[in-house]
């Protein structure tokens, strides 16, 4: 399984090193299976070679930005990393909540896609554009250049993608998360009057790092895609997004082997789905108490 994940990730995005680490990192939080290192590395590299051999090409984004780690940029990266964590958590929570709502519907097998499709069509008509549909490649491309993206863009993309996934349409969440991160990074750069290419590159990998709980793989991916000169800010943004996103994520079967905080305690083999369900029960009891008090 880990080797297959590594091969798929490395070949799809043209990042064989990141693919290998992703396969090692994604199944459980806080634990890396080094006994699977060689199979994952070989699988990812071979998958990438095969894809390139049959003529498949990968899109490259222009993040050619001169970079010097000044105190201003240092604190800006920490701040934007926290924003990336918030976007990761919001996306994961919204997606799981909508999945829960969809599955609770009577005749959900039929109603879920009908309702979800109708909502997406209505939102597309309201937006007046199809730019928020699909993977978001056009939005990613625009995020690396001026003018900077509006802060509303990443929120709208979160809503579109969460509804699509939550109501049963499975078109992938990885590239839309790249889009959400890139547009948020671009918006942050516009707000702080900095280079959008730098923060779009950081958001591209950091939001996914927080949502998938794979900071090492996403750091390496950022280096493979955007260059080693951005290694330090990429690593900072990915780690901050990973830590601050909490025990949330897009992969509900992901186990928690080592909590992100010493203050958090979980039973053995606890998954993110179990954490979400426990959090939801606590929230429901709290709302019930407040309702009874009022």
Q: Each PLM stretch: what is its role?
A:
Residues 1-294:
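Alpha-helical transmembrane segments and immediately membrane-proximal extracytoplasmic
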